[in-house]
A protein has these predicted regions:
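Basic, glycine/lysine-rich polyanion-binding surfaces/domains
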Residues: 1-180
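Single conserved hydrophobic/aromatic residue that forms the stacking wall/gate
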Residues: 179-188
Length: 188
């Protein structure tokens, strides 16, 4: 992917976890440290069964309302169901925001340019009220933008980016990154 290109990822889901207990709630059930998540840092994490078996993986981004979880569209419903199992008496709301948010990916070089412009060296920056974060798994996978569609298009226009096809984006990824989500069926 070239510096001035962006791809809008299809088949991604966005879940909002909010409420006064949201930080403690997530800290107790995910594989990463929720205390690392701030408006300047985002993480990649997973949800496991109590026996340690894989259930789901997602990015966690801090939002004004709580935490956004960027996950596979196919697993959004299942992830909400799994998170809800652990809710118990926690003061937490778990909502599917997939219809309100989209995920875009920009080149790592463009992200570095924005970091310099905003005088930041963090892995998550806010550009015009839109969070943009460097993929914590591998910087070569670019930086993700999570926004509503209208705001994403305004950001794309302001940054003079050209939208490329999903297929072109995945064809540019190294073979080991073409299937980033683990299978959700057939796991014993």
């Amino acid at each position: 992917m070239e510096k001035d290109q962006v791809v809008i990822l299809e088949k991604r889901g966005v879940i909002l976890v909010s409420g006064e207990d949201s930080r403690d709630f997530l800290q107790n059930i995910i594989t990463n440290d929720i205390n690392k998540v701030s408006n300047k840092n985002s993480v990649f994490s997973a949800l496991l069964t109590p026996q340690g078996k894989y259930l789901n993986e997602f990015f966690i981004i801090q939002n004004v309302k709580g935490y956004l979880l960027d996950c596979s569209e196919n697993s959004t419903g299942e992830l909400i169901k799994d998170l809800s199992k652990y809710k118990l008496r926690s003061k937490v709301e778990i909502e599917d925001f997939s219809s309100e948010f989209v995920i875009g990916v920009i080149n790592n070089s463009k992200f570095k340019e924005l970091q310099e412009e905003l005088k930041s060296n963090e892995n998550t920056i806010t550009y015009r009220d839109t969070p943009i974060f460097l993929d914590p798994r591998n910087r070569k996978l670019g930086a993700r933008i999570i926004s509503n569609l209208e705001k994403l298009y305004l950001t794309i226009k302001k940054l003079s980016l050209k939208i490329i096809d999903n297929k072109e984006y995945y064809s540019l990824a190294p073979v080991s990154y073409t299937h980033l989500t683990l299978p959700t069926t057939g796991i014993v």
